[in-house]
Structures are given as structure tokens and as C-alpha cells.
Amino acid sequence: MSKRCTFIALSNQKGGVGKSTMTVLLASYFHYVKGKNVAVIDCDYPQFSIQALRSRDMKNVERSESLQQLLCRQYERTGKKAYPVLTSGPGKVLETADRLSGNSDILFFDLPGTVNTPGILEAIINMDYVFTPVVQDRMVMQSSLSFVATLRDFIRQYPEAPLKEILLFWNKIDGRVSREVYRHYNEIFEKIGLKTLSTVMPDLSLIHISEPTRPY
């Protein structure tokens, strides 16, 4: 296939680490804030979480005049319509990407976590970057490291593959946990040759957002 844009995948074989949420956040940031032409390919069969979220949002907009007004204001401010979200079976990821790459600056892929799924490893080595969210949980950590190790072993067989880097990043950071814990994990990652982003994402479920009816 002829790749004419940047391919970025978020992938981890452990569920609940925020993979789909981060895909949406990154796509929205680059599309609406940075002005890039972005598309998302939801490959996480069978749940297709991002496509389900988009369908729910569209129904909410259809039922709400205030949301319609907000959408119009956003378009007036940014000149950007909603970015496309397509679903794809694991074996047709690159075929779907080929249809979108000519009109996009960045394609984001929400990949399934099972690397044994046919076509997934081939898709991963054709990415430019793979971001793997990790959380401070022993079982999740073991699963994440096993996942990355499998990818690295496979990539070594294809030295000419487009994939540049696999990068880990901390998600759902619990502010109550000592930073020494995260520093210790980062040292382990570094010793085994894994790169970790310095930017971390907090656990928003621990942040109480004040509401007009809620006392401080």
C-alpha cells in the first residue's frame, strides 16, 4: 500500500487501561486544536467502542438543540467538521487505511489487544508509532510488558518495517500513590530498553468536579 500520512496506533492486550479514550482525545486534539486532517479506524472488534461512542453522540445531537448550536459554533471557530470514524475487521486494517490516507494527515488506530488475531501484527509493524498505555497495577503491568515483548520479537523479523517506536505512557495516574513507585517502574522499563513518555494522564475518576448543586 502507498502510505501518505502518519499512522498512530494505541494498543494494549489488557482492557480498561484507557486505550479507546486516549485515541479519541488525541484525534480530537490534533483535529480541532492543531488543525490536522484526522481520521480514526476502530479495529477493536467486536465492541467497536469508538464507533459506538460516535453513534451515541450523533443521536444526542439530533435530540438536543443546544448541542446543535454548540456544534455550529465549533465549526465556525475551527472550520472543522467531525473527523471520520470507520470500523475495520482485524484482517482489513491496512486496506481501510489505504482508502483514507490520501485525505488525512494522521490516521489513528484503536487496535484489539489480542496479538494472535490474524492481521494485527502485520498492521502494527506498518504503523509509524505505537503508544501503549500502562496503569499502576501489577497484573496490568505484567500483561503490558508481555504484549510489548511480543511486538518487539515480531518486529525484529522485519527490519525494513515502517514502525519507528513503541512508546509507553502512564495513564490513570493516582495522585495518592508515591511518585517513587512510578519512578521505580520507569527504571525497570529503561533497563529493558523501553521508552516511556514524560507526560502522564491523571485518573479523572478521582477528581471531583464541583456542580452547582453540590456544596464545596
Where are the regions a protein language model picked out?
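Walker A (P-loop) phosphate-binding motif
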Residues: S2-Y32
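P-loop/Walker-type NTP enzyme "switch/lid" segment
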Residues: S11-V17, Y32-F108, T114
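Ser/Thr-centric signal marking residues that sit
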Residues: S20-M22, N171, T213-R214
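Short, well-ordered alpha-helices that flank and scaffold nucleotide-derived cofactor binding pockets
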Residues: V24, S28-Y32, S55, I125, ...
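Conserved catalytic-core segment of NTP-binding enzymes
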Residues: A39, P112-T199
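Short aromatic-enriched loop/helix-cap "lid" or pocket-rim segments at secondary-structure transitions
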Residues: I50-R54, R179-Y182, S210
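Short, glycine-rich, amphipathic interfacial segments at transmembrane boundaries or analogous
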Residues: P202-L206
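Single conserved hydrophobic/aromatic residue that forms the stacking wall/gate
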Residues: I207-Y216
